[in-house]
Amino acid sequence: MIFTGWESPLALLKYELVQLEYEGVQVPKEIAKRVTCLDDESHKMDFDLVDEIYSDLNNLKVSSSFPYEQPYTLTEIKKARPSGPRRFDSIEDKDLLDKFHGAWTGRAVGCALGKPVEGMGIRGQKGLIGRAAIKEYLKNRNHWPLDYYFSGEDVGDDFVVYCPNSQRENIAFMEPDDDIHYTLIALAIMEKYGAEFTWRHIAHTWNSCLPYNVICTAESQAILNYNNASPRSTASDWVTPEYTSLNRNPYREWIGAQIRADGWGYGCAGNPELAAEFAYRDACWTHRANGIYGEMMFAAIIAGAFNVSDPIELIKIGLSEIPSNCKLAEACMQAIEKMKVKKDFYSYMDWVEEDFGDLNGVHTVNNALVVIGALFYGELDFHRSVCFAVEGGWDTDCNGATCGSILGAVHGLSNMESTMIPPLNDTIKPSVIGFQEITMKELAKRTFDVYCSIKNS
């Protein structure tokens, strides 16, 4: 079967071995050796050979000694979660509108801040891991610690940054980015379908609004699976979220769902349980296990942030909507304990890198730890926390955006003081059909209307 997607068939297969081990499947040594012996050039497009090995992998089961409980269905997830607030009292309309404006603005600021160094944060440069490379880049320009947008200034150190429209010399709006695109998509879905939307509505909206070349990793695989299994001329009941999330999708516990949490948190402001449910519908067809839980957790945190202004309480609100014995919950609970003894964000990140540095730079768990650490050590100060989230490395624009979104919901735009807000001119220019250019003020108004509709449904 011819199947690619985000990367070559061989690359997908190699990532699949890593993913299977992570989710508790013991890959036989003979299969692992066969894959290791394949040449990255001569075998990368060998569909038949890769298919044959994939068939062997499909028969493997999770080990009985795997210590985690990581259910897939929403019903099972709810049974496995701890107690939590589920829902808070309503907020004054005038305050809520300001908080929506703050959340959209915070998301854009954090995204733009991290965008030029996303590649550096994930892959590192010049022999340095991401966080160290970012620090060296900033120090070489006398910009450490991070306090404003990255400069594209060439000082002869051979570091490379990207996205000139998000650099301090040029920034005038929020440029296209998937972290913003999916928040816009969530808004469009809730506007059109209300609270009863399904995962199929989401897939259809992607097809209608998102160019394939702006979709990455797990999302690339899932939408390809969906379209390959769905006749163009009619709807198909055959394709399932189990198929779209699993078939040739080794990225199913990466960060792609986690960055899609925000819109559901906005639409369900004050209702973490419903926000997590909406996030589940969004994640279940592209991700599995901790990939799903990451989106559910942050949707719940964002929904709670409209009412709660304590970082530990917010983290626990998020944890109350995911299984208590999953890898993400375990990591976050360990992080809360480390926050009691690590004196600052940088020593905290030393621990994160030591214990979770073997994960891919765009995995759900390690990046979630960056965000919650930035919230805690930044003491919910918008400017400082967002800068920490980007300094932490790995997926810098995603983490900056999530952190900024939470803080915007906590404070509202009128209470957010940052030199990084004015340069965006309240404007987003995305690559989403139907949102070619729009102000964050308008997005806040539309989000408020969606919130009222869902609340009253």
Task: Please state what every model-predicted region is.
Residues 1-457:
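Structured, active/binding-site neighborhoods that engage oxygen-rich ligands
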